[in-house]
Amino acid sequence: MSKNLYKIAKAKKIKYFLISFVDLFGVLRSKLVPTRAIKEMQTNGAGFAGFAAWLDMSPADSDMFAIPDPNSLIQLPWNKEVGWLASDLWMDGKPVDASPRIMLKKQIKSLQNEGLIMKSGVECEYFLISSDGSTIADTKDTQSKPCYDQSSLMRRYELIKEICDCMIEMGWNPYHCLLYTSDAADETVR
């Protein structure tokens, strides 16, 4: 039996759900759904126009529906009123082949059929930049090779600690935090 998201929301005081999927460019797409509507969304899915989310579709295609996976529920540590859900995309009664999650599931199944196990994970990387996006956030970071620099790391300690604490609370089990600084133009070349 599937988990009842409405009951879970009431027990955990979740007011909204982010029903989410990833497009072909790796952008997370979502709809914010109030808890009162989650029962219907859990059954029928949240409607999206696939062409508007960079999936291989046109405006003439039917809407697709993101059916949330209750086992993926993460109550956001920085906003406990919100529960995040991964979803599977369906259109016209069939899985959407252009969905990265569907592609991954197919690959996992294919490998299992060959007696293999796929292991995957997330490397959480992010950039700390100024509010206007013009410079790195730490203007004291002037080293040519700043990776692993303790002074730089500790100047950003409060923010890095908050991010790491949230990952721990979500059950992601991070095992270290480090600081690596690089020019964004250099990163696009690598």
Residue locations for each model-derived region?
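ATP/Mg2+-dependent ligation/transfer catalytic cores
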Residues: 1-176
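Single conserved hydrophobic/aromatic residue that forms the stacking wall/gate
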Residues: 180-190
